[in-house]
């Protein structure tokens, strides 16, 4: 640090005062040089009060605060010095030091360079610049900085030696050799240069010259222990073990208890195959005082080979701490760190290994693998290519490069890499597993299953492949050996958690398996810690957070972070909320993690949020978090969790004082950096709060919300064409919906209004009834024209000037209406015949993805169908390859194939609308229908559910509780079956419940987005008031209910 107090400014004070000032300045400088920073600061402050514009005093204060790690104060005084003298190079250099310590290397480099422009002969500036450039990875720039320093003072032999070390690390051995020789020429007795020159000769294979220079170094400095060690090493390389032992024994004669020499002697024993003797000697070295990395590396290798990984790690750590120039130690230790999930440490070790040995293919590949985990995909790709350049048959590098390309959405490139890896090594299990992952993500589940099974044949103990295979089999409902598979999967997770490894079961999948709550939470915790590891490499200081609302005009700033602002179920649920916040009390920021998909969903959120920021254009998590923090966010909301597209690293950096999970992820984050999870009493009962790492923050009704009333207002009303059976008018055989439905009905003759009684609400279907009006179109020529349109597959017809469209043709008429981006403008006809559903049967449905079905669920459904003879189950081909498995298991349970009817997945609007055709939805207890539950309820179809132990298994019960339909919530499997059977056999009861759901979806809070937003605001204010009072996050389980008029 530049700390001069010379050039004291002119003064009109008496000479006596000047001498006093100068004397005090010299005293402060002596105290600074002696390391008595407290006294130096005290005297400097006296000087500063006398002459606040004295740049010498300002520089010394800057240096003192820097040494005391008070970087902000150091920068402050440097800045004051610059204001007094904008040409003061030392002040810019001091600022550069502050930036370098903060990890802001580019800013540091720019300040050093500015200092050098002001003072070209500023040698300390060049040295500082070189150090910053090395830290930034600009080795060539660092070399030039050292060269410039030496141009001004060629006799700086230490700097020249440092330059030699840098050149040696770059592999420019001849230039390094020249530096060391010049240093020796300047100072012939500089033993370090002799030893370093010996290292260069050793690297060049000049063994005897290396031996000579090490011996010269020892001659110049008989206490130069490292030179003895290097001499022993080079003799060991030459396999001259006797002389190597002699060199180490000579070192021991100088320092009998020196661990370095013991370690290197043990290394020779190891090379001779005397493993036990080597380990004993290594242990003796460690018992003394560890100083030599080779000994630790070799001991670690031996210990790891014997299964003593923890001890091996200790030895590698010591080697790294003392000498970061042992490539194998660095690489091997990095491997252990990566296995443990300590990503930052692994990266540092790999980089060090490559500094020492740039042509180290394995280190390139290993580093690339970790960089990929950190999201640094381009840099990872570069290292994989280097590994392959160095070793063209490096199958691991090809396979891992495929992983990177896959993450970069280059599916074809990834396929080529995996295929090449398998060509090089057909028995490469990891490559087969990686190839399977490509097939899995592409929806090609059968191919994925085949490749995972190949991987497991080649490598039976392969947890990742086994757990991914289990998930694939779950997706297609292949339940062969299901119980045994679940048992083994749980065992794998238990073993991985016990060994502190990243579990092979993803947090988002953990709900599907019979894991304990502790295991599920621990899986999430491991992934949360992985996020912390990824951001630790940024070395960012913690953010300072506001305690009041003064800087935001009294408004609470809420930031919603999501990769799903677009055509995604999450946006379908919450797209209206940003625009419904009270602008007088809330300022809404939406941070998109994905590019614009061009849909109206994206446009709506962009238009209605106060601020919309596309963070997908800021791939660096540190810079993205800076942006959030600069916006002064008070509450930052995580809408992704561990779903696709998440960037939890942003939250790990804590850019906001309060951070909450909400809506998009059905479980705990397990992360220390998430304060709250927004939930409700039914979904997350207080008695299971220990399942969550976050504090519970309750909404008064349900934490779930749907924007269905805004997206699908045409489904608020319906009319039916008269379909009589046993004297009943059915409301779900031929259904008409449309914004202009009333006007259309008014244009028709003979439309009947049938009054249907339904309960007023509550948990009893027999409570007081309200009449609902059901418009019924009689079977006349108009009805016949509509039916003929459906039967003939026509897209659209016109009746009385109104466009009547086939419900299967929405995409052809208006694609944005089909996706839910716009409200359809036609009258849409939906019929059971369109989907092959029987007209006279009870239709049970479930529109979830098939992975949510397990054997016990299908058995329960089969029992229901058996008890309701005239009934069918309507499922989706989601995916299609699951259909034959479901049919086969159902037949094994005694159900003929025609009792289960499959339909293709449909566009969003049709998906919601066709739910009207079912009589009852049977929920999946393993993992409920969340968005699909809202869809079917908006269609007016009752849903029977049975809450389980996980958040994901209790959402439907929360929705039904909010809807006021507690009679549809079962306590156990038998009750689930009984409720469903009663609905299927007691048609009057079914009509009442259907009427109740139809009415309650409008009158209850479930789809009331405005009221929900107000309740959410109240919860946000609770969080903020709790924080502003100086409290740590705590459970908020006494929600305040508000009404829309509040």
From Swiss-Prot:
Motif (Nuclear localization signal): 487-503
EC code(s) of this entry: 2.4.1.255
Keywords: Acetylation, Biological rhythms, Chromatin regulator, Cytoplasm, Glycoprotein, Glycosyltransferase, Lipid-binding, Nucleus, Phosphoprotein, Repeat, TPR repeat, Transferase, Ubl conjugation
Modified residues (Phosphotyrosine): 989
Gene Ontology cellular component annotations, sorted alphabetically: cytosol; histone acetyltransferase complex; nucleus; plasma membrane
SUPFAM superfamilies in the cross-refs: TPR-like (SSF48452)
Phosphoserine: residues carrying this PTM: 3-4, 20
InterPro entries, per database record: OGT (IPR037919), OGT/SEC/SPY_C (IPR029489), TPR-like_helical_dom_sf (IPR011990), TPR_rpt (IPR019734)
Domain of life: Eukaryota
Phosphothreonine carried by residues: 454
Localization terms from the record: Nucleus; Cytoplasm
Pfam families attached to this UniProt entry: Glyco_transf_41, TPR_1, TPR_11, TPR_12, TPR_8
Entry text on domains: The TPR repeat domain is required for substrate binding and oligomerization.
Record text on subunit structure and interactions: Monomer; may exist in different oligomerization states in cells. Homotrimer, oligomerizes via TPR repeats 6 and 7. Trimerization is not necessary for activity in vitro, however it increases affinity for UDP-GlcNAc. Component of a THAP1/THAP3-HCFC1-OGT complex. Component of the NSL complex at least composed of MOF/KAT8, KANSL1, KANSL2, KANSL3, MCRS1, PHF20, OGT1/OGT, WDR5 and HCFC1. Found in a complex with KIF5B, RHOT1, RHOT2 and TRAK1. Found in a complex composed of at least SINHCAF, SIN3A, HDAC1, SAP30, RBBP4, OGT and TET1.
Protein name: UDP-N-acetylglucosamine--peptide N-acetylglucosaminyltransferase 110 kDa subunit
Gene source species: Sus scrofa
Gene: OGT
């Amino acid at each position: 640090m530049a700390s001069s107090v010379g050039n004291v400014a002119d003064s009109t004070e008496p000479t006596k005062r000047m001498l006093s000032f100068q004397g005090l300045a010299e005293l402060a400088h002596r105290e600074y040089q002696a390391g008595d920073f407290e006294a130096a600061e005290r005297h400097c402050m006296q000087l500063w009060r006398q002459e606040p514009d004295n740049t010498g005093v300002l520089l010394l204060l800057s240096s003192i605060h820097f040494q005391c790690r008070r970087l902000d104060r150091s920068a402050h005084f440097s800045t004051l010095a610059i204001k007094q003298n904008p040409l003061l190079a030392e002040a810019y250099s001091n600022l550069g030091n502050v930036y370098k310590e903060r990890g802001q290397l580019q800013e540091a480099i720019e300040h050093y360079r500015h200092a050098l422009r002001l003072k070209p002969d500023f040698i300390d500036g060049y040295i500082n610049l070189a150090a910053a450039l090395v830290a930034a990875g600009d080795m060539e720039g660092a070399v030039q900085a050292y060269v410039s320093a030496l141009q001004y003072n060629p006799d700086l032999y230490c700097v020249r030696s440092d330059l030699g070390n840098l050149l040696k690390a770059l592999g420019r051995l001849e230039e390094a050799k020249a530096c060391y020789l010049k240093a020796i020429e300047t100072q012939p007795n500089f033993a370090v240069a002799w030893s370093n020159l010996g290292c260069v000769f050793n690297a060049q294979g000049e063994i005897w010259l290396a031996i000579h220079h090490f011996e010269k170094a020892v001659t110049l400095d008989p206490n130069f222990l490292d030179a003895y060690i290097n001499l022993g090493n080079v003799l060991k390389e030459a396999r001259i073990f006797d002389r190597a032992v002699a060199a180490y024994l000579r070192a021991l004669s100088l320092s009998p208890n020196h661990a370095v020499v013991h370690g290197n002697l043990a290394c020779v024993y190891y090379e001779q195959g005397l493993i036990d003797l080597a380990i004993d000697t290594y242990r003796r070295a460690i018992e003394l005082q560890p100083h030599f990395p080779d000994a630790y590396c070799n001991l670690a290798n031996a210990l790891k080979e014997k299964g003593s990984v923890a001890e091996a790690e200790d030895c590698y750590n010591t080697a790294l701490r003392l000498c970061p120039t042992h490539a194998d130690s660095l690489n091997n230790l990095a491997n252990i760190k990566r296995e443990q999930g300590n990503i930052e440490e692994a990266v540092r070790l790999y980089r060090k290994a490559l500094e020492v040995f740039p042509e180290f293919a394995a280190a390139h590949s290993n580093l690339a693998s970790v960089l990929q985990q950190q999201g640094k995909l381009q840099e990872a790709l570069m290292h994989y290519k280097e590994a392959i350049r160095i070793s063209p048959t490096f199958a691991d590098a090809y396979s891992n490069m495929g992983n990177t390309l896959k993450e970069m959405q280059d599916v074809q490139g990834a396929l080529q890499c995996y295929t090449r890896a398998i060509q090089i090594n057909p028995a490469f299990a990891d490559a087969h597993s990686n190839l399977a992952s490509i097939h899995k993500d592409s929806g090609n589940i059968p191919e994925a299953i085949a490749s995972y099974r190949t991987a497991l044949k080649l490598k039976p103990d392969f947890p990742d492949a086994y757990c991914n295979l289990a998930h694939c089999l779950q997706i297609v409902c292949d339940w062969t050996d299901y119980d045994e598979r679940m048992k083994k999967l749980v065992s794998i997770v238990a073993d991985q958690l016990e060994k502190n490894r990243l579990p092979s079961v993803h947090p988002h999948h953990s709900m599907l398996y019979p894991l304990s709550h502790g295991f599920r939470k621990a899986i999430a915790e491991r992934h949360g810690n992985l996020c912390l590891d990824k951001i630790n490499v940024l070395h960012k200081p913690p953010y300072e957070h506001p305690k009041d609302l003064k800087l935001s005009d009294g408004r609470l700033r809420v930031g919603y972070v999501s990769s799903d602002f677009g055509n995604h179920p999450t946006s379908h649920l919450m797209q209206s909320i940003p625009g419904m916040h009270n602008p007088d009390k809330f300022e809404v920021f939406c941070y998109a993690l994905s590019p614009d998909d061009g849909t109206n969903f994206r446009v709506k959120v962009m238009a209605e949020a106060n601020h919309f920021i596309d963070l997908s254009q800021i791939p660096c998590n540190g810079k993205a978090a800076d942006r959030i923090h600069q916006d002064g966010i008070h509450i930052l909301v995580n809408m992704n969790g561990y779903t696709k597209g998440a960037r939890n690293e942003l939250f790990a950096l804590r850019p906001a004082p309060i951070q909450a999970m909400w809506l998009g992820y059905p479980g705990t984050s397990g992360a220390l950096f998430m304060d709250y999870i927004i939930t409700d009493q039914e979904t997350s009962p207080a008695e299971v709060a220990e399942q969550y790492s976050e504090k519970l923050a309750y909404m008064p009704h349900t934490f779930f919300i749907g924007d269905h009333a805004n997206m699908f207002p045409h489904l608020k009303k319906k009319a039916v064409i008269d379909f009589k059976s046993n004297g009943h008018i059915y409301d779900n055989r031929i259904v008409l919906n449309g914004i202009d439905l009333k006007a259309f009905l008014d244009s028709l003759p003979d439309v009947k209004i049938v009054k249907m009684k339904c309960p007023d609400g509550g948990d009893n279907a027999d409570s007081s009834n309200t009449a609902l009006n059901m418009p019924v179109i009689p079977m006349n020529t108009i009805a016949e024209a509509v039916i003929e349109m459906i039967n003939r597959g026509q897209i659209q017809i016109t009746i009385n000037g109104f466009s009547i469209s086939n419900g299967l043709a929405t995409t052809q008429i208006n694609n944005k209406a089909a996706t839910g981006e716009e409200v359809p403008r036609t009258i849409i006809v939906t019929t059971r015949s369109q989907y092959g559903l029987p007209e006279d049967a009870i239709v049970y449905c479930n529109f979830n993805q098939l992975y949510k079905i397990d054997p016990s669920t299908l058995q329960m459904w089969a029992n229901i169908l058996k008890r309701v003879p005239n009934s069918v189950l309507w499922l989706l081909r989601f995916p299609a390859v699951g259909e034959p498995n479901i049919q086969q298991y159902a037949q094994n349970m005694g159900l003929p194939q025609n009792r289960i009817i499959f339909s293709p997945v449909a566009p969003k609007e049709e998906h919601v609308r066709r739910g009207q055709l079912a009589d009852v939805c049977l929920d999946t207890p393993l993992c409920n229908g969340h968005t699909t539950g809202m869809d079917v309820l908006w269609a007016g179809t009752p849903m029977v559910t049975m809450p389980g132990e996980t958040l994901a298994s209790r959402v439907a019960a929360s929705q039904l509780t909010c809807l006021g339909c507690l009679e549809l919530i079962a306590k156990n499997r038998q009750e689930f079956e009984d409720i469903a059977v009663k609905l299927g056999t007691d048609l009057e009861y079914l009509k009442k419940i259907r009427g109740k759901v139809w009415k309650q979806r409008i009158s209850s809070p479930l789809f009331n987005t405005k009221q929900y937003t107000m309740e959410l605001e109240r919860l946000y204010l609770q969080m903020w008031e709790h924080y502003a009072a100086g409290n740590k996050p705590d459970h908020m389980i006494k929600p305040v209910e508000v009404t829309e008029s509040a």
